[in-house]
Amino acid sequence: MPLLLSGQKFRTDLESFGCLAILSPLEGGAETRLLRRLRASGYQTQVTSARGLGDPVVFLTQLHGIRPPHLGHQNVGRNGALGEVQQVIPQLNELLVEDKPLVLWLLEGQVLSKSELLAINNLCQKEPRIKIVIEMGGARSIKWQPLNEFINKD
């Protein structure tokens, strides 16, 4: 249990690899302690779900268009058959303005494909201020490894 009390090994692994795949107990609690330790050491943290990301790199870092849900009968002549496209600012845009490093914690990472995981791993290498932790499932005790090792293992 001393591993969870300090979080030092987790933080040093996160700083050296940039992107970690984590297996945590399903009852929760361990990841919250790690997040609290990261915040105390000067990181900004954001927790979000991996479901519905689409292209993760574009969703997180670039201006992109979305189509709002269809709400019944609408005038087709106004916006075409597909509906209007709304431009959305990237999720990490405002968080990277400050000098503090950012940890993005992605829940339900097991839904991401191998190519999406590789793209996220490349994002960590291109932008050194972004550190990403992806929950890839459950385990009896908390375990983590670099994301590229996790991808190559399968």
Swiss-Prot record:
Coiled coil: none
Major localization listed first in the record, in broad terms: membrane
GO MF terms, alphabetically ordered: oxidoreductase activity, acting on NAD(P)H, quinone or similar compound as acceptor; quinone binding
Listed EC numbers: 7.1.1.-
Catalyzed reactions per annotation: a plastoquinone + NADH + (n+1) H(+)(in) = a plastoquinol + NAD(+) + n H(+)(out); a plastoquinone + NADPH + (n+1) H(+)(in) = a plastoquinol + NADP(+) + n H(+)(out)
Gene Ontology CC terms, in alphabetical order: plasma membrane-derived thylakoid membrane
UniProt topology in membrane: Peripheral membrane protein
Record flagged with keyword Nuclease: no
Keywords: Membrane, NAD, NADP, Plastoquinone, Quinone, Thylakoid, Translocase, Transport
The protein's enzyme class: translocase
Pfam families in the cross-refs: NdhN
InterPro entries for this protein: NAD(P)H-quinone_OxRdtase_su_N
Organism domain of life: Bacteria
Compartment(s): Cellular thylakoid membrane
Recorded family membership: Belongs to the complex I NdhN subunit family.
Record's subunit section: NDH-1 can be composed of about 15 different subunits; different subcomplexes with different compositions have been identified which probably have different functions.
Function: NDH-1 shuttles electrons from an unknown electron donor, via FMN and iron-sulfur (Fe-S) centers, to quinones in the respiratory and/or the photosynthetic chain. The immediate electron acceptor for the enzyme in this species is believed to be plastoquinone. Couples the redox reaction to proton translocation, and thus conserves the redox energy in a proton gradient. Cyanobacterial NDH-1 also plays a role in inorganic carbon-concentration.
The protein's name: NAD(P)H-quinone oxidoreductase subunit N
Species, as recorded: Prochlorococcus marinus (strain NATL2A)
